[in-house]
Design a protein with these regions (language model features):
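Reductase modules of NAD(P)H-dependent flavoproteins
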Residues: 2-3, 141, 148-258
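Ferredoxin-reductase
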Residues: 2-87
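Short, conserved phosphate/pyrophosphate- and ester-handling motifs at nucleotide-, phospho-/glycolipid
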Residues: 35, 118, 221
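Short, Lys/Arg- and Gly-enriched loop/turn segments at beta-strand edges
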Residues: 46-53, 96-104
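Conserved S-adenosyl-L-methionine
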Residues: 107, 131-138
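Conserved beta-strand elements of the Class I
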Residues: 110-113, 217
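Ser/Thr-glycine-rich phosphate-binding loops at phosphate-binding pockets of nucleotides
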Residues: 115-121
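Histidine-anchored nucleotide/phosphate-binding helix
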Residues: 121-133
Length: 258
């Protein structure tokens, strides 16, 4: 029995020459928790070429959504970026991943800290009503180099606050904090520096991170994970050592930009 199903591409959206999003059909048997990832790929020379992708759609949605970087000579992304509606992709049957809210200790505020395509699992988590029931505030931080790289900006500034079911919770609880490192922007710099200087907390009107109230999830490059973990440790938070064991913050260790 194959470890994956064939799905049909429904839409493709190119944000920039570096980032694109695609949606595809979802097998009825696929069950996942918001924040998890699956293997996605194509048949190449008669063999499946697969890579790990966080599911960017919520587990209650009928389709699947994925957010990808374009790597011109990347074995898979060099091909995936040319997808069109109607094409076929392979999606694994077994989701996995460490960004599961149930592995966090109870707290008041949930920080979702991401760079680049690392925002993908948080696109799913910010559509999860249970997350808003669990926390008083959910702070989504997305760090990119240039303003044009802020994919999904409109989702958080316009679409989600007006969402038929989630809108009221989003307006009350979700704080979107986009960060740009290489050009002028209200929140300019690197996430870690904005946390250490206290500017981020001043901007959003919350006290600096503390282990009593604050929980976090991290997704980004290996360097970002290392640096941001160091900052959270400095604030007194402890990482969940592995799936199924609770901690103050969680790291997705499965990804490097590919």
């Amino acid at each position: 029995m194959a470890a994956f199903n064939t799905q049909k591409v429904l839409s493709v959206h190119h944000w920039t020459d570096a980032y694109f999003t695609f949606t595809c059909t979802r097998d009825e048997s696929l069950r996942f928790e918001n924040g998890q990832f699956v293997m996605v790929g194509l048949m190449v020379d008669g063999k499946p070429l697969m890579r790990a992708y966080s599911v960017a759609s919520a587990n209650w949605e009928e389709h699947l959504e994925f957010f990808s970087i374009k790597v011109q000579d990347g074995p898979l992304t060099s091909r995936l970026q040319h997808l069109k509606a109607g094409d076929e992709v392979l999606v694994s049957k077994k989701p996995t991943g460490t960004l599961i809210c149930g592995d966090l200790n109870p707290g008041k505020h949930l920080y979702l800290l991401s760079t680049g395509t690392g925002i993908a699992p948080f696109l799913s988590i910010t559509k999860d009503p249970e997350v808003y029931e669990q926390f008083e505030k959910v702070i989504l931080v997305h760090g990119v180099r240039y303003k044009q790289d802020l994919a999904y900006y409109e989702r958080f500034t316009q679409e989600l606050p007006e969402h038929e079911y989630l809108g009221e919770m989003v307006k009350e609880k979700l704080i979107y904090y986009p960060v740009v490192s290489r050009e002028e922007y209200p929140h300019r710099g690197h996430i870690t520096d904005l946390m250490m200087s206290g500017k981020m907390f001043e901007d959003i009107g919350l006290p600096p991170i503390n282990p009593q109230d604050d929980r976090a999830m991290l997704c980004g490059s290996p360097a970002m994970l290392k640096d941001t973990s160091g900052v959270l440790n400095h604030f007194g938070l402890t990482v969940s050592p592995k799936m199924g064991q609770r901690g103050d913050y969680l790291i997705e260790r499965a990804f490097v930009d590919q």
